[in-house]
């Protein structure tokens, strides 16, 4: 829950001086990206801006305290303030902030700006007390905020010092409106107005001016002069002389003498006790101070001018002026040291009653009350964990003695989950083993099962599927149905292990169970994970359309639950890119891979390896080897600077080996083959992929026999495990082996099998990537006119893509080739005496490549009737009557020129 007072603009009091000269300057604030108000404490920053904000409905106000250095807390309040200003316009950003479903503050702000792009009226956000922010991550995010905020948005920052927000750059570009302490200082006229409103008897203008000069227009000093004069019935000028030259760092003695020592004991104790509260209301005051009517007491303190300010329009929430509050808390530690723990305990109890466990934890920690802290955590820790209050939980658990954790083992489990969320896998097992050894008495079976569920998750994350499976099964055998979270974890892990083992049907069933449980209990990250796993399994089974539909459900879940900035979102867009690539939708595949990189923009560059691999794949499928080489340079640098799962390495090696194949780089392939480890098994898609990489390198090096052994074994495993997509890939590589080793009949046989299987998988790019060797075979099959209709259609599509992307459209019939052909001693006399025009040679090349008349017209951007004329002319010059004759004639010319066709 968010504390309402932190989002309420301070109430404008009747007796405050309206700063007309400053308000006039602020009237043009909407023309600037940043309004910055800086000064030491007590110069009236908040009062001035609250006067300026009066009447502005589309303005959000966020009052900071020390706890706002937590990124998640800062984000939640900032988005909530903007929601107040816009009347709930940014609902997606709000949901992401509330559920902590964003990768970083900058990515959350990027989503916010997408929503604000549809907001066209002036909009303001005030952040008060920004000097309390010391977290560099928040500073970086706010610099991003200022760079990218909409033109109609003005950020207003109040701070005691110059914030780290790139101020100089804004100043140079005239996008900064500044007000400092010299401008905030009261002038003579304002000081006279102030005293006239605060003192019972007026003073002369000259005396008022002298007092203003004595304290350099410092508003807090003027307020203290008026307060002291009222309390001590002395002249205001006497107080002014005492304050002359004083500053905030020397104010403590004055406040003791002139404020605390001049109130009755009851009020003094009230001030000291209530000061421990960062914000306060009636219920908190009653519990902390023991006063019977907290609201009435707060209003009385406010009337006395004791630096108490209302934080909302209803008058329910109050806070002390920061300067006075800090002074009071320091005095409280000195004067009420013995009572202080009990005061904090009372505050914690009241915050708990009002439903603010994080504030309660703050006071329990301050009280040093381990038992109270333990009780709060036992009741609320998992809720805080699910809302990503990880830093607060870690601080709290560190404050508890180990013995207390052992007496409450679920807190040990919580600490272990915190470690798991930070990828500290070895520490998780060490902690759980120590706890099991030291817990007194027989350990509860259910708790032991929860330990095992967590251990199973750690094991699979750490690349140990056998141990993960053992632990997941143990957990599921012992966990009651009501322990849904651990059951979801264990079921998910078991399904993932079966996926790794190639048991796809059972794995799919378990992942579907995981999804159902996770949706039922609103555990959305596991629901998303299970959908991603289901899609991968369906892809491996060769059911790419089913995989597409599962991905659509996952994208819908992301949209509904605002999961766009979870790292898992990158996993989803990546497998979508893989599917699009398989279907030769290369532009969409590339866009999807780039969106995955964008999701991971705030993570280590190594996390982008998989998406970068897909970008290389897209370049290779297009035949753009220059771009592929540039991307491979980046990829190989990442490979040399990180440790990766074997799946990641297999995919990265795949594009490297294909690049070496397309460029004939046998040296690199041989070096890689010498050093790459050979997996012990081939029972899942990534192990199959790495063995396929090995076979491709062997084929490139002419090592046909060992490559054939590898591929035959891969096919046997793929058929037995129903890894149909891998079987399709294996057949295509086996086809290349047979073709290059001169076994043309075997090559044709497996190519026909691959085309038939592609009716199920929909593969296109896997054929295209093999280039001209594949094109030659497909032309022959098409010419035979014996392919079934679906295979014939697919072969024609593949051939079109090869011609389009691998630059074979005119490769054999360009100007240089034609010139060499005409000078060849064996060129037919008919061609020498009636040479084709360059356009007719292009048309002949496209006919040879399998293009229809309509496709040739589209390729050359001319009318179909024009193409018919070109075809009629070239038929006449070649002395042929039919298309098939023209294809055979072109083939003979290519053979004559030394091209293997």
From Swiss-Prot:
Q: Which family does it belong to?
A: Belongs to the MalT family.
Query: HAMAP family, from UniProt?
Result: HTH_type_MalT (MF_01247)
What protein does this entry describe? Answer: HTH-type transcriptional regulator MalT
**Which key words are in the record?**
Activator, ATP-binding, Carbohydrate metabolism, DNA-binding, Nucleotide-binding, Transcription, Transcription regulation
Question: Which ranges carry the HTH luxR-type domain?
Answer: 829-894
Q: What taxonomic lineage is listed for the species of origin?
A: Bacteria, Pseudomonadati, Pseudomonadota, Gammaproteobacteria, Enterobacterales
Domain of life where this protein originates: Bacteria
Q: Which PANTHER family match?
A: DNA-BINDING TRANSCRIPTIONAL ACTIVATOR DEVR_DOSR (PTHR44688:SF16)
CDD domains cross-referenced by the UniProt entry = LuxR_C_like (cd06170)
Q: How is its activity regulated?
A: Activated by ATP and maltotriose, which are both required for DNA binding.
What is a GO molecular function of this protein?
A: DNA binding
Q: Which GO terms describe its biological process?
A: positive regulation of carbohydrate metabolic process; positive regulation of DNA-templated transcription
Sites binding ATP sit at 39-46
């Amino acid at each position: 829950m968010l504390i309402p007072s932190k989002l309420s603009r301070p109430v404008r009091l009747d007796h405050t001086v309206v700063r007309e000269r400053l308000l006039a300057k602020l009237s043009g604030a909407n023309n600037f990206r940043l309004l910055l108000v800086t000064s030491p404490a007590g110069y009236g920053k908040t009062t001035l801006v609250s006067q300026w904000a009066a009447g502005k409905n589309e303005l959000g106000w966020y009052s900071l305290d020390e706890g706002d250095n937590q990124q998640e807390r800062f984000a939640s309040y900032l988005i909530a303030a903007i929601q107040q200003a816009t009347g709930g316009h940014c609902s997606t950003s709000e949901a992401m902030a509330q559920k902590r479903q964003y990768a970083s503050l900058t990515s959350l702000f990027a989503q916010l700006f997408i929503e604000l792009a549809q907001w066209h009226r002036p909009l303001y956000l005030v952040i008060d007390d920004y000097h309390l922010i010391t977290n560099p991550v928040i500073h970086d995010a706010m610099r991003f905020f200022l760079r990218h905020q909409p033109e109609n948005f003005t950020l207003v920052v109040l701070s005691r010092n110059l914030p780290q927000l790139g101020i100089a750059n804004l100043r140079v570009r005239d996008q900064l409106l500044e007000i400092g302490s010299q401008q905030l200082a009261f002038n003579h006229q304002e000081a006279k107005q102030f005293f006239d409103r605060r003192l019972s008897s007026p003073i002369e203008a000259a005396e008022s001016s002298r007092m203003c000069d004595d304290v350099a227009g410092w508003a807090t000093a003027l307020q203290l002069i008026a307060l002291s004069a009222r309390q001590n019935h002395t002249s205001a000028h006497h107080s002014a002389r005492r304050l002359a030259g004083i500053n905030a760092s020397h104010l403590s003695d004055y406040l003791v003498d002139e404020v605390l020592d001049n109130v009755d004991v009851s009020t003094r104790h009230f001030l000291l006790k209530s000061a421990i509260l960062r914000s306060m209301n009636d219920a908190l005051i009653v519990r902390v101070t023991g006063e019977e009517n907290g609201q009435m007491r707060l209003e009385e303190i406010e009337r006395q001018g004791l630096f108490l300010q209302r934080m909302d329009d209803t008058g329910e929430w109050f806070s002390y002026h920061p300067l006075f509050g800090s002074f009071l808390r320091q005095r409280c530690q000195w004067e009420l040291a013995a009572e202080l723990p009990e005061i904090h305990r009372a505050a914690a109890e009241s915050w708990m009653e009002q439903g603010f466990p994080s504030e309660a934890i703050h006071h329990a920690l301050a009280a040093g009350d381990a038992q109270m802290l333990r009780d709060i955590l036992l009741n609320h820790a998992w809720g805080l964990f699910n809302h990503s209050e990880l830093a607060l939980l870690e601080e709290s658990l560190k404050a508890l003695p180990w013995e207390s954790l052992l007496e409450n083992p679920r807190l040990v489990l919580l600490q272990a989950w915190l470690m798991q969320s930070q990828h500290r896998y070895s520490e998780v097992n060490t902690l759980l083993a120590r706890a099991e050894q030291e817990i007194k008495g027989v350990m509860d079976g259910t708790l032991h099962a929860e330990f095992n569920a967590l251990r199973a998750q750690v094991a699979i994350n750490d690349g140990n599927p056998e141990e993960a499976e053992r632990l997941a099964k143990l957990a599921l055998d012992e966990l009651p149905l009501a322990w849904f979270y651990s059951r979801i974890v264990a079921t998910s892990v078991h399904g993932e292990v079966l996926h790794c083992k190639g048991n796809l049907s059972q794995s799919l069933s378990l992942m579907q169970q995981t999804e159902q449980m996770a949706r039922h209990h609103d555990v959305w990250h596991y629901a998303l994970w299970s959908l991603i796993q289901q899609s991968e399994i369906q892809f491996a089974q060769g059911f790419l359309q089913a995989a597409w539909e599962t991905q659509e459900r996952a994208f819908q879940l992301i949209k509904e639950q605002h999961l766009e900035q979870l790292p898992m979102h990158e996993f989803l867009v990546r497998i979508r890119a893989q599917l699009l690539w398989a279907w030769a939708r290369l532009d969409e595949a590339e866009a999807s891979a780039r969106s995955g990189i964008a999701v991971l923009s705030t993570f280590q560059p190594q996390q982008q390896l998989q998406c970068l691999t897909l970008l290389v794949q897209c370049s290779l499928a297009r035949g753009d080897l220059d771009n592929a080489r540039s991307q491979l340079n980046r990829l190989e640098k990442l490979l040399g600077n990180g440790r990766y799962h074997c799946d990641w390495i297999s995919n990265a090696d795949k594009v490297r080996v294909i690049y070496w194949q397309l460029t004939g780089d046998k040296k690199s392939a041989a070096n890689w083959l010498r050093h790459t480890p050979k997996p012990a098994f081939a029972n899942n898609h990534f192990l199959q992929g790495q063995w396929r990489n090995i076979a491709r390198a062997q084929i490139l090096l002419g090592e046909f026999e060992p490559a054939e052994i590898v591929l035959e074994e891969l096919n046997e495993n793929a058929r037995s495990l129903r890894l149909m997509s891998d079987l399709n890939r294996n057949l295509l590589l086996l086809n290349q082996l047979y073709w290059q080793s001169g076994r043309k009949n075997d090559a044709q046989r497996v190519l026909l099998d691959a085309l038939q299987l592609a009716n199920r998988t929909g593969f296109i790019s896997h054929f295209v990537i093999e280039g001209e060797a594949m094109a030659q075979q497909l032309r022959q099959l098409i010419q035979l006119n014996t392919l079934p209709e679906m295979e014939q259609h697919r072969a024609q599509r593949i051939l079109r893509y090869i011609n389009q992307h691998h630059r074979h459209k005119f490769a054999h019939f360009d100007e240089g080739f034609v010139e060499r052909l005409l000078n060849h001693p064996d060129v037919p006399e008919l061609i020498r005496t009636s040479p084709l025009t360059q356009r007719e040679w292009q048309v002949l090349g496209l006919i040879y490549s399998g293009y229809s008349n309509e496709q040739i017209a589209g390729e050359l951007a001319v009318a179909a009737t024009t193409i018919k004329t070109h075809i009629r002319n070239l038929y006449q010059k070649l002395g042929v009557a039919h298309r098939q004759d023209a294809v055979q004639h072109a083939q003979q010319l290519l053979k004559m020129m030394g091209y293997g066709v």
